[in-house]
Amino acid sequence: MLIAKVIGTVVATRKNSNLIGSKFMIVETLPVMGETQRLVAVDQAGAGIEDLVLVALGSAARMQSGSENSSTDAAIVGIIDNPEEIFIK
C-alpha cells in the first residue's frame, strides 16, 4: 500500500463494464514513500482533491472492486484523517 495525495480527476465516459460507475482520481505518491510517481486510481473511498489517501495496488486493488477479473491496478481504499499525525522515521 502507498500513501499518496489526490491531485486530479480523470473523466472516462467509455470504459470496461467492470468499471462503470467508478470514479477515477490522479494520485501522486509522497516523496517519503520513495521516488514520486503519478497513478490513476479507482476511488473506493470518496476522496477529493488534496486528500491524503491509502492506495492499494495489484491484486489488492482488484479485490476492492469485487471482481478478480476487474482491470483495476490501483484503488484508493482509505482517506487519512489526520495527515499531520503521520510518523515516518
Question: Language-model features: where?
Answer:
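Short alpha-helix capping/helix-loop boundary micro-motifs
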Residues: Q37-A41
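C-terminal structural segments of small proteins and small subunits
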Residues: L54-A56, A60-K89
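OB-fold and OB-like single-stranded nucleic-acid-recognition modules
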Residues: M1-I3, D43-Q44, D81-N82
